[in-house]
Swiss-Prot record:
Name of the featured protein: Thiamine-phosphate synthase
Role of this protein: Condenses 4-methyl-5-(beta-hydroxyethyl)thiazole monophosphate (THZ-P) and 2-methyl-4-amino-5-hydroxymethyl pyrimidine pyrophosphate (HMP-PP) to form thiamine monophosphate (TMP).
Organism phylogeny: Bacteria, Bacillati, Bacillota, Bacilli, Lactobacillales
Sorted UniProt keywords: Magnesium, Metal-binding, Thiamine biosynthesis, Transferase
Pathway: Cofactor biosynthesis; thiamine diphosphate biosynthesis; thiamine phosphate from 4-amino-2-methyl-5-diphosphomethylpyrimidine and 4-methyl-5-(2-phosphoethyl)-thiazole: step 1/1
Cofactor(s) the record lists: Mg(2+)
Binding site for Mg(2+): 71, 90
Domain of life: Bacteria
Organism name: Lacticaseibacillus casei (strain BL23)
Length: 213
């Protein structure tokens, strides 16, 4: 995969938005500089998830941004998304790779060096490490120390993104950590002005990511 796709990775969250507002937020983020979108829907039926994924993919395709589906291999394949992202309570990494084939992107959430190395060996294309900071979207998620993040980036040959409570104000924390990008939820999805927020994040990232110039 292209590691530059991971610079500013939007992970969606519906909050109380209706579908039109939700889609408009994704479109605004895509138009203004996010580089990848993950559709994460835990509560929808399979049919509703499929139909929403189709609508989101129309947006990401318009801006030529990869769409990743959280957890659901079936939805990923049904809408021909760029790939799927799985956590440690989903299908095993090797099985997921077998199901999606060699060409789709496979992202895996990890919290330790050991699980990171194992995920890469089993076929992960990139890793999401965190939660780095406390996060409202996963209130009980344990915090992963920056030292662990650095150790993971040093040990694996695939790109790593930091996730969990990432905000414009704490991006400086990630200097010299070796990450390829950051995954952000509420800082974008709940921003009063998404266009301005995404542009500000991209500007701030130029001082953080060594290859974002």
């Amino acid at each position: 995969m292209n590691a530059t796709d991971l610079k500013l990775y939007l992970v969606t969250h519906r909050y109380d938005d209706n579908e039109a507002t939700f889609l408009a937020k994704i479109a605004a983020a895509c138009e203004n500089g996010v580089t990848m979108v993950q559709l994460r829907e835990k509560m929808l039926s399979t049919r509703a998830y499929f139909e929403l994924a189709q609508r989101v993919k129309l947006i990401t395709d318009r801006y030529q941004i990869p769409l990743i589906i959280d957890d659901r291999v079936d939805i990923c394949l049904a809408v021909d998304a760029a790939g799927v992202h799985i956590g440690d309570d989903e299908l095993p990494v090797a099985m997921t790779r077998q199901l999606i084939g060699p060409d789709k992107v496979l992202g895996v959430s990890t919290k330790t060096v050991e699980t990171a190395v194992a995920a890469v060996a089993a076929g992960a294309d990139y890793l999401g490490v965190g939660a780095i900071f406390p996060t409202q979207t996963k209130a009980n998620a344990p915090v992963t120390p920056i030292a662990t993040l650095k150790a993971i980036t040093a040990q694996v040959a695939v790109p790593v993104v930091a996730i969990g409570g990432v905000k414009e104000a704490n991006l400086g924390t990630f200097k010299e950590t070796g990450i390829a990008g950051v995954a952000i939820v509420s800082e974008i999805m709940q921003a009063p002005d998404i266009a301005h927020k995404v542009q500000a994040l991209r500007t701030k990232l130029k001082a953080v990511l060594p290859n974002d110039r």
